[in-house]
Amino acid sequence: MTAEPILSPETAIAALSGEDNQIRYYAAWWLGKHNVQAGFTALCVALFDERYRIPSGGYPLRRQAARALGLLKNPQAVPALIAALECDEDLRLREAVICSLAAIGDKRAVTPLLNLLQSSQAQPYEALIEALATLQVWSARPQIEPFLQHYSERVQCAAARYMYLLTQESEYIERIVKNLNHDNMYLRWAAVFDLGAVAHQQAVQAILTAQVPNSLKLLNLKRILEAMLNNNSVNHEKAALLFGAIDDLLIQL
């Protein structure tokens, strides 16, 4: 029997319990994309559904369910997400879970995340360090500072982001800005997102001249502007410059 097209929350929720893995994956994406809070329970079930497993050992549906729960930002998902951290077979699933816990921002995630950081097993360190920064877990500084020398430049950037948010010292921002001109396109993209996440106003010009798509520049300049406008002491001159830069980028898109 042909599966019903996913055109509504009801059909998406029903599809999650179906047999077609591709449709189930799309249904999880659809529920997150459209912020369907009614899909919360079905997504929590899908988070532990091991039927869809690829030859390399990963669980695509579980990953997508984790991402969708992060988009819903429902704190009731935190216990399920924490339990999903225990899956050692799929680090990409663990990475998706960590990102969603950071997006929800519930402090119940702090201890499990610290346990992962202190584990002797390899972890998705970039996501883990970024999550601890988002949750403002500054007690992790002794464990995170050594990652400034990690072999992965993206992990180094995550550590620099954490250290800047903690100390506000410009040396850490400079480490991120340096990667805006890196030969690796994905590292340039990661650096732009790091600068947007810390809302560093002095990085605006560096973002504008970086070799990244205008859509990424626009997204992260908007994040910096929003952070600036939420600040009680807005620098109106800098805000005006940001508005102008955003307008110019919109025209170019």
Swiss-Prot record:
Q: Which domain of life is it from?
A: Bacteria
Q: Which GO terms describe its molecular function?
A: lyase activity; oxidoreductase activity
Under InterPro entries, the record lists:
ARM-like, ARM-type_fold, PBS_lyase_HEAT
> Per the record, GO CC terms?
phycobilisome
Matching Pfam families, A to Z? HEAT_2 (PF13646), HEAT_PBS (PF03130)
Concerning PANTHER family, the annotation shows: DEOXYHYPUSINE HYDROXYLASE, PBS LYASE HEAT-LIKE PROTEIN
The free-text function statement in the UniProt record for this protein reads: An enzyme involved in the biosynthesis of bilin.
Could you say which protein family the record assigns here? Answer: Belongs to the CpcE/RpcE/PecE family.
In its UniProt entry, what is this protein called?
Bilin biosynthesis protein PecE
